[in-house]
């Protein structure tokens, strides 16, 4: 192999390694920012299409209805826990340390973002309540159709 070809091969190889490293770093950075949406039943039983369950420690979003009588507040701090349910019957407990939205109440549809502690518990870093009587994210709306307290959107 002549020196010119060796030089081209070396440069091409270095570029391929650098590109692979850059792609790997980008994917690693994005992995930490991707939040997957689950319902309580999907967390317990897995996604319908794939059967894939979230892993303990995984960052995710969960949507459902706050179970009546499940909200427990710590009188000495902002810590609160409550149960979420969907039409599949799965119940997941959410722990949150912070100020809940003004529209948060029992029987209300909410979305919580946080990390999965175990198969039925989530440590939420953020809790979102729907902002008016009509709007609800499509994923939550689909998951809650058939619930007693839920009125589906009329688009």
UniProtKB/Swiss-Prot annotation:
Cytoplasmic side of membrane: 1-8
InterPro entries on file: CcmE, CcmE-like_sf, NA-bd_OB-fold
This protein's UniProt keywords: Cell inner membrane, Cell membrane, Cytochrome c-type biogenesis, Heme, Iron, Membrane, Metal-binding, Signal-anchor, Transmembrane, Transmembrane helix
Entry superkingdom: Bacteria
Residues that, per the record, bind heme: 131, 135
Gene3D superfamilies found in the cross-reference section: Nucleic acid-binding proteins (2.40.50.140)
TM segment ranges: 9-29
Pfam families associated with the record: CcmE (PF03100)
UniProt-annotated location(s): Cell inner membrane
MF annotations from Gene Ontology: heme binding; metal ion binding
Cysteine pairs bridged by disulfides in the record: none
Topological domain spans for side Periplasmic: 30-155
The family this protein is said to belong to: Belongs to the CcmE/CycJ family.
Role description: Heme chaperone required for the biogenesis of c-type cytochromes. Transiently binds heme delivered by CcmC and transfers the heme to apo-cytochromes in a process facilitated by CcmF and CcmH.
Name listed for the protein in its UniProt record: Cytochrome c-type biogenesis protein CcmE
């Amino acid at each position: 192999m002549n020196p010119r070809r060796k030089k081209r091969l070396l440069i091409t190889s270095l570029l391929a390694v650098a590109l692979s490293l850059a792609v790997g770093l980008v994917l690693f950075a994005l992995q930490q920012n991707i939040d997957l949406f689950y319902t309580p039943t999907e967390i317990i039983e897995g996604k319908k299409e794939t059967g894939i369950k979230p892993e303990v420690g995984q960052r995710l979003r969960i949507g459902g209805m706050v179970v009546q009588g499940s909200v427990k507040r710590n009188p000495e701090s902002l810590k609160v826990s409550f149960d979420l349910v969907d039409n599949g019957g799965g119940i997941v407990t959410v722990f949150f340390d912070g100020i809940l939205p003004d529209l948060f109440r029992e029987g209300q549809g909410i979305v919580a973002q946080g990390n999965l502690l175990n198969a039925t518990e989530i440590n939420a870093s953020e809790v979102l309540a729907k902002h008016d009587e009509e709007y609800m994210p499509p994923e939550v709306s689909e998951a809650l159709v058939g619930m007693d307290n839920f009125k589906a959107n009329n688009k």
